[in-house]
Structure formats: structure tokens, C-alpha cells
């Protein structure tokens, strides 16, 4: 969800790479195999439509939340049906919370809402750099002339690593290959006082932008992050798994399956955030069999984990996943409900 890309002896059988055409299946413990049948058949158009309308109502309700994080997630989810939700997304541009404003502009950029983009010009004077960068993204992505210089300035000099990461993401999304040298230069420009684990996160996000712009050499470094050697590296491992799924890096499939199944000497696996990121990314690459990982966390006591599970169900997108999402739309936590709504719209649109 709002851009939330973070958090992770005996091994189960790791994987089966089944054919030369690139299909694979994650090994699944027999005791955890999913039932083939589900309660509701969402392949029926009317049934799927009813679930979609439930998701839409959830997004509408979430957009009115007093919690700005829920409002921001609702706006991002609204992007899955952007034309229907265009007024709701535009309303976010004037939200009192800077995060909500930024997400609204980023959604206009990513969904290329050309009718809404001119409304972002006023945000170029926003007090928050996150909003100004999002406005530049929205305008540029929709073909409106705008000075991109603040993106480069933020990438190279901003005190916040999160701001630098946002700048890198936008440069990657805009698709201008001339940004690659700047992104490469930024790898050496991080503040010396910064937390090394957070610098690693930033470098992975810069690498993702460079991969999107055609620099495939960066894939190797991202794959290397799939091998955490200490607890401080687990967040980077989860992010690396997410990035490799986004860029469809099939060479990393075996590494990701290993990451999801690894157990230390005490039999403990990596944290839920890591394993769910792997399951989500493998589903993006059509690797079957990872739903049992998601099932094991869908009932977690932690809402953030249930929300991440909902996102993964949306990526898997099969009938069993839609049945689980139908239940998560009734979750007691609003963050989980809006995550489930987002996932339903993604799954049904497939």
C-alpha cells in the first residue's frame, strides 16, 4: 500500500523449476495444502461484481477516515479504478496531511489522469518537498511541461533518506534514461552520519530506478540483498524481494524460494514481512504454490501483517484468494479493510 515497501538446519524442499518456458512451483508442506474448492465461485460475473462493489464502498468509507494513513491508502486503492474515483483522488490534493496530498499526486501520475494533472500545478508551491516532487511527477507523467530540477536536488542533497528514495522512484518511473548517471552518482552521495541499514534501503531503491531505466547490472546487487546475515538486514531483504518481483527478475526465483523456506538452527523462519514479500513477488512472476505462506499469516494478530497478506492475495488473484479477501473486507482494523479492497480490485481486474 502507500508505498509501503518494507518490513524476515532444516530446510523444506526448496523449489521445483518445472520447465524451460519459465514456470515454477514453490514447494508446499502437505499438511498445508489448500483446498481446491472454495465457498464462493468468483468466476461468475455477478458474484465478482458484487465483491467489487463491496471493495469500492470500503474505499469510499476509508477515504473519510480521521486517520491520514487510511485516507492515503484509500486514495492509492482508488487508483485501481481511477476514472470512477477521480473526484476522490482530486480531493486528496488539498488534504491537510502532506502524505495524503503526495499520494494523491503520485496516483494521478501513475494512472496518467490527464484531466486531473493540471490541478497539481498549485502543489509546486507546497511547503513539503514530498508534495512538490509528487506534483512534478504528476505533471511530467501527463505531458505537462515542468522543471524537474528539484528531483535531482532532492536526490543528491536532501537530509531525509526517504525523500531521496522518493526522488529516485519518480526518476525511474518517468523513464528518462538520461537520469541513470545522476542516479549512479547519488549512490556515493549519502550522508556519512546516516544509519547504514537505511542507506542500504535507499541504495536498493536507487538500484530499482536504474533497472527500470535499463541498467540491468543493478540486478546483481539487489539479488545479493536476499541473503541477510543479521537482523538489521531483514528489512533490506524484504525490499529486495519486492523490487525483484516488480522488475520480473526470474533469475532470482530460486533465491527467493530459499529465503521463504529458510530455517535457522532453532527452526525459526524469517519474519512474516520477508516471507510475504517473497510470496507476493513470486506470484507476480507466475510462480505457483506460494499461497500457503500467505494463508499462514492472514490471521495474524498484527494488522500490518494481515494487510500485507491481503496485498499478496490480490497478486495471486485466484478464487481461493478472493474468498479470503471477502473475509478480510470485514476485518476489525481499517488498514486491513482498505488493503483488502485494493487487493480485490487488482485481482478482479486481472
Stretch-by-stretch model annotation:
Residues 76, 106, 137, 169, ...:
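Residue-level signature of alpha-solenoid helical repeat scaffolds
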Residues 53, 68-69, 83, 98-99, ...:
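Alpha-helix N-cap/helix-start positions at coil->helix boundaries
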Residues 72, 87, 102-103, 133-134, ...:
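Alpha-solenoid HEAT/ARM repeat scaffold
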Residues 22-25:
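Bacterial signal peptide processing site
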Residues 2-10:
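Bacterial N-terminal signal peptides that target proteins for export
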Residues 49-64, 82-94, 113-125, 144-157, ...:
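Amphipathic alpha-helical scaffolding segments comprising HEAT/armadillo-like alpha-solenoid repeats
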Residues 17-20:
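C-terminal motif of bacterial Sec signal peptides marking the signal peptidase cleavage site
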